[in-house]
Amino acid sequence: MRPRALYTGPVEEQRSIRHRMQFILTFSCPDQPGIVAAVTSVLAERGADITETHQFSNRESGTLFMRLAFHAPAPGNLAEINAILAPVAKRFGMQMRLHDAAVLPRIIIMVSRFDHALLNLLYQVRVGWLKADIVAIVSNHTDSAATAEQAGIPYYCWPVNKQNKTEQEDKLRALIKERKADLVVLARYMQVLSDSLSAELSGRVINIHHSFLPSFKGAKPYHQAYARGVKLIGATAHYVTADLDEGPIIEQETARVTHNLSVEDYIATGRGVESQVLARAVKMHVEHRVMINGHRTVVFA
């Protein structure tokens, strides 16, 4: 018996769907009437089919944030569509970005000894939930070398100390350029990036902190939480800035704990939360659902 097609409509329509390219448009600008109509009208005139829209108007700053996903007739390309949208962007003073949804974002993952968040990211990529290309794994330890080898991903072990930190960060800069990485993910990488590197990679580095920020910043947050007798522990995925654990928050989650649990129980519970929160944050970033709004983020989940 022949398998049934997922779509049973007219053959011509199926051909049309196959020959359309998907793009994602994100922009922010001073809010005023007519912006959405202007953008969607230009896309409609080009024959685009808008499949998803999200928008948020920040009343405090008077800024509009918007994300649109759309199909455009082939052979469409970024340069052509950017040129079509340029007059609208200029008219409304937009900060605009257009992305080809077929191009997988390239990610470098950095990890120290605890590999639970790394393993979950690799799994989510393998099963197709996280659509990205992991182009390298960097660590200051050798612990995850076998994991990288099994996954067929280049592994770089660069131990870090006060004397060689600048040299090792220069290696990272070179690797990002060589591998054409779009994003760096700190999956429990226990080294603090320098202020200069944090600024250079602004909006391109996501960290998972093992506490529900802004509570318990810095080292050993589970021990801090245990000492305070909290009833909830959590994890926070945020963009990295020069201020430690102060970057714009992308995603958070909590888990309930009780008085009869040990610090080790807190840590074990937290590992699952960290892995889930980081994976969700990375997914939202690579799908261009996160827009930085000062010290905050707009997340079109």
Model-derived features: positions:
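N-terminal amphipathic/basic-hydrophobic helices that include classical n-h-c signal peptides
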Residues: 1-20
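A conserved regulatory-domain signal marking ACT and ACT-like small-molecule sensing domains
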Residues: 19-105
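Short hydrophobic segments within beta-strands
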Residues: 28, 108-110, 138
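Short, glycine-rich nucleotide/cofactor-binding loops
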Residues: 107-117
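Histidine-anchored nucleotide/phosphate-binding helix
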Residues: 116-126
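Short internal beta-strands
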Residues: 132-143
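Donor/substrate-binding cores of folate-linked one-carbon enzymes
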Residues: 141, 164, 168, 182-301
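Adenosine-nucleotide cofactor-binding segment
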Residues: 149, 153-179
